[in-house]
């Protein structure tokens, strides 16, 4: 039976019912709805709506229902209830009879669903934080094992300067640390309870909403009933967190797809995260990474869609807000899955050090070192930049790396160049000189790994 049928003289058209009902997706809020109902039953005792014995009966029945849901959540989908609130109330009435009809006193589905969703979001954020830190840990461990793997760093997808595979891993640790910080920040704003705000104007019963918030594990209660039932900022924030986080994972995936390609050949992915071709027997495709990259778009779409849904809504609750859940559930599920999959990709990855080093020695990645050498000899940097550009053109003409050019050829471009230039052009020198904080020198990379291990308690 619908929770609102008394006002109507005709039954809803079945097509409208299917269009209107939300149980097919909000069934995921079952546990939160039951937990919120237990807390609400306690609040009703404090204002004399329920006796202590009635509340005990309701709580016992709700706890039984909670266990049933945990064992078999799919049972909910066999019902024709309108939404999860209707389903829980119907099941409660089945268990305790007329007493179950007293539970909704002073409560609206508006504050009820807002509470359910915040509880679900809090739990999901904790799962995301755990997965995020697991991926950070996997990256740190991979960095630890590959501090000596020199490879080219890129700008514009052109070889630029030598870096290490460890330094590359640590770049993504930094991105994930920012994602972690955003989630922690979002969690603070999630931690206020809307329960007790009614449909929009507050509840008619003098319930202690701060006490009620505490029973549900919230830090405090919201301050304005109109805002409380219409607020979906937390949905937007989480979708934004997910969108940014998925951009980071997509870039991670794109880098590794390139590193794994025959053109680069820097890494080989485990058989456990790759697949083959139905036609070409030789293929080993990076499907896990391509799916991470591909799934980024649907998360961006969920954020954009939710913004468009909310932008024109007047206060307070509108049925449009029912559209908040499917996109949110899918986006956070997707982000969580991709965090786990990215960690799995790193488990078993093989870094091909000789190929990485060979690539780092090509493409004149040490050209900046020659410019810095000239600066140390008193040549202004802009002039040094031009000189080295000319030297690179000559090296290309001769088909040699810079360090293979004879001294006489180098001195054609600047008389200050001496024999001491050659050690400066080695890969190791290129790395060693980047010794400022955040640089790629072995000492800085080792320190960054130690710092990350300490922060992650590894």
Curated annotation (Swiss-Prot):
Coarse class of the protein's main subcellular location: cytoplasm
Q: Which reaction does it catalyse?
A: 2-(N(omega)-L-arginino)succinate = fumarate + L-arginine
- EC number of this enzyme: 4.3.2.1
- Name the UniProt key words of this record, in alphabetical order: Amino-acid biosynthesis, Arginine biosynthesis, Cytoplasm, Lyase
Domain of life assignment: Bacteria
Q: In which pathway does it act?
A: Amino-acid biosynthesis; L-arginine biosynthesis; L-arginine from L-ornithine and carbamoyl phosphate: step 3/3
Which GO cellular component terms are attached? cytosol
MF-aspect GO terms: argininosuccinate lyase activity
What's any GO biological process attached to this entry? L-arginine biosynthetic process
Q: Which Pfam families match?
A: ASL_C2, Lyase_1
> Where found?
Cytoplasm
HAMAP family from the entry? Arg_succ_lyase
User: Can you tell me which family this protein belongs to?
Assistant: Belongs to the lyase 1 family. Argininosuccinate lyase subfamily.
Query: What is the name of this protein?
Result: Argininosuccinate lyase
Give the species this sequence originates from. Answer: Salmonella dublin (strain CT_02021853)
């Amino acid at each position: 039976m619908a929770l609102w049928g008394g006002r109507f003289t005709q039954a809803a058209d079945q097509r409208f019912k299917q269009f209107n009902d939300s149980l097919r997706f909000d069934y995921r809020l079952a546990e939160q709805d039951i937990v919120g109902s237990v807390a609400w039953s306690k609040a009703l005792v404090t204002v004399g709506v329920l006796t202590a014995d009635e509340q005990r009966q309701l709580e016992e029945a709700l706890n039984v229902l909670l266990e049933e849901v945990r064992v078999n959540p799919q049972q909910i989908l066999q019902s024709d209830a309108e939404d999860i609130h209707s389903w829980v109330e119907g099941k409660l009435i089945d268990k305790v009879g007329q007493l179950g009809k007293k539970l909704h006193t002073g409560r609206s589905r508006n504050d009820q669903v807002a509470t359910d969703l915040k509880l679900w979001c809090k739990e999901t954020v904790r799962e995301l934080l755990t997965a995020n830190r697991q991926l950070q840990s996997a990256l740190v461990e991979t960095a630890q094992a590959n501090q000596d793997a020199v490879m080219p760093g890129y700008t514009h997808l052109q070889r630029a300067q030598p870096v290490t595979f460890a330094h590359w891993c640590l770049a993504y640790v930094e991105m994930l640390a920012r994602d972690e910080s955003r989630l922690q920040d979002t969690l603070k704003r999630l931690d206020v309870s809307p329960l007790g705000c009614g449909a929009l104007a507050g509840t008619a019963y003098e319930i202690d909403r701060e006490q009620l918030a505490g029973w549900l594990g919230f830090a405090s209660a919201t301050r304005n009933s109109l805002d409380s039932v219409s607020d979906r900022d937390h949905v937007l924030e989480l979708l934004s967190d997910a969108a940014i986080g998925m951009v980071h994972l997509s870039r991670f995936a794109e880098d590794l797809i390139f590193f794994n390609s025959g053109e680069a050949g820097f890494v080989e992915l485990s058989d456990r995260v790759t697949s083959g071709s139905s036609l070409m027997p030789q293929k080993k495709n990076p499907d896990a990474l391509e799916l991470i990259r591909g799934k980024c778009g649907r998360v961006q779409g969920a954020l954009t869609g939710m913004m468009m849904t909310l932008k024109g809504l007047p206060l307070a609750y509108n049925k449009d807000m029912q559209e908040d859940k499917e996109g949110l559930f899918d986006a956070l599920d997707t982000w969580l899955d991709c965090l786990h999959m990215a960690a799995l990709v790193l488990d078993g990855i093989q870094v091909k050090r000789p190929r990485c080093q060979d690539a780092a020695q090509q493409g004149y990645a040490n050209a900046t070192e020659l410019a810095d050498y000239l600066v140390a000899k008193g040549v202004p940097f802009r002039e040094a930049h031009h000189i080295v550009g000319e030297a690179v053109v000559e090296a290309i003409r001769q088909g040699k790396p810079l360090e293979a050019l004879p001294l006489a050829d180098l001195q054609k471009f600047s008389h200050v160049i001496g024999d001491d230039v050659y050690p400066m052009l080695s890969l190791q020198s290129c790395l060693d000189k980047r010794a400022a904080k955040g640089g790629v020198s072995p000492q800085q990379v080792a320190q960054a790994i130690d710092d990350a291990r300490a922060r992650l308690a590894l």
